[in-house]
UniProtKB/Swiss-Prot annotation:
Keywords: Amino-acid biosynthesis, Aromatic amino acid biosynthesis, NADP, Oxidoreductase. InterPro entries: Aminoacid_DH-like_N_sf (IPR046346), NAD(P)-bd_dom_sf (IPR036291), SDH_C (IPR041121), Shikimate_DH (IPR011342), Shikimate_DH-bd_N (IPR013708), Shikimate_DH_fam (IPR022893), Shikm_DH/Glu-tRNA_Rdtase (IPR006151). This is Shikimate dehydrogenase (NADP(+)). GO terms for biological process: amino acid biosynthetic process; aromatic amino acid family biosynthetic process; chorismate biosynthetic process; shikimate metabolic process. The gene is aroE. Pathway: Metabolic intermediate biosynthesis; chorismate biosynthesis; chorismate from D-erythrose 4-phosphate and phosphoenolpyruvate: step 4/7. It comes from the Bacteria. The lineage of its organism: Bacteria, Pseudomonadati, Pseudomonadota, Gammaproteobacteria, Moraxellales. Involved in the biosynthesis of the chorismate, which leads to the biosynthesis of aromatic amino acids. Catalyzes the reversible NADPH linked reduction of 3-dehydroshikimate (DHSA) to yield shikimate (SA). Belongs to the shikimate dehydrogenase family. It comes from Acinetobacter baumannii (strain SDF). The keyword NADP applies. The active site is at residue 66. GO terms for molecular function: NADP binding; shikimate 3-dehydrogenase (NADP+) activity. GO terms for cellular component: cytosol.
């Protein structure tokens, strides 16, 4: 019997999840159908519950419903609890289970690039939900110190305070985007600057070996500046594929290889 999956969001037409999951299915021999599902901004819960009531096997959640999905789950993975957001849902024994595969997707993408994560010092630009979701997996993968830089320093400080309890083994620090300096192994752009076109200026006194842009398929002043410095760089398509592979393997018990889809 064909398993039914969906990705839910608003907007949703831009999602590439169906093509990815159908490609994984073809490679692994899983019989599935994966659809986009547009939910009204005030209708996430009813749309999600009706999908599972109709026999849906699993659902991915995208903007702006990840926090709502988190709040509705009966059972959460550790990384979802720390992220306080869920992008992967499934029903088990009548209970709604939730996970967050974004951070693992980023780690898989960085490892596929053969950038070392062990004992690294990482700078993340932005202190929103995207940043919260990747800290724990980065630390698990070996990152030694993570500095979070944000326009509003208080927001970065709040995030560090929240995460210090959840990820006590990590060295976490908050700084203002106006105070960017020092040496880092990897800089990750998790701000919406690349999405909105706001130019983010990286000062000369900020040094880094690699640059990763979480967004993909759009112009990025962050990546332009990495290119000018002749620093190896990548954009977020690998992260998208990586998080999709993680969700696919949770649902179907088989893991496609990331390198086959990059």
């Amino acid at each position: 019997m064909t398993k039914q999956f969906a990705v839910i969001g608003n907007p949703i037409e831009q999602s590439r999840s169906p093509e990815l999951h159908h490609a994984f299915a073809e490679k692994t021999g899983v019989d599935l159908n994966y659809q986009k599902r547009l939910a009204p901004l005030d209708g996430f819960e009813s749309s999600m519950r009706s999908f599972f009531a109709e026999g849906g096997s699993g659902m991915n959640v995208t903007v702006p419903f990840k926090e709502q999905a988190f709040a509705l789950c009966n059972v959460l993975t550790e990384r979802a609890q720390i992220a306080k957001a869920v992008n992967t849902l499934w029903m088990e024994n009548g209970k709604l289970h939730g996970d967050n595969t974004d951070g693992q997707g980023l780690v898989a993408a960085i490892q596929a690039l053969e950038w070392n994560l062990e004992n690294t010092t990482i700078l993340i630009l932005g202190a929103g939900g995207a940043t919260r979701g990747v800290i724990y997996p980065l630390v698990q993968a070996g990152a030694k110190k993570i500095v979070i830089a944000n326009r509003t320093l208080a927001r970065a400080e709040q995030l560090v305070d929240d995460l210090k309890t959840a990820v006590p083994q990590a060295q976490l620090q908050a700084i203002s985007l106006n105070d960017l300096e020092g040496d880092f192994d990897i800089v990750i752009n998790a701000t919406s600057a690349s999405l909105s076109g706001d130019a983010l200026q990286l000062p000369e006194k900020l040094k880094f070996k690699y640059a990763y842009e979480m967004a993909y398929g759009k112009p990025s002043s962050f990546l332009d500046q990495a290119k000018q410095r002749n620093v190896p760089y990548a954009e977020g398509f690998g992260m998208l594929v990586g998080q999709a592979i993680e969700a696919f393997s949770i649902w179907n018990g088989v893991r496609p290889q990331l390198k086959d889809f990059l």
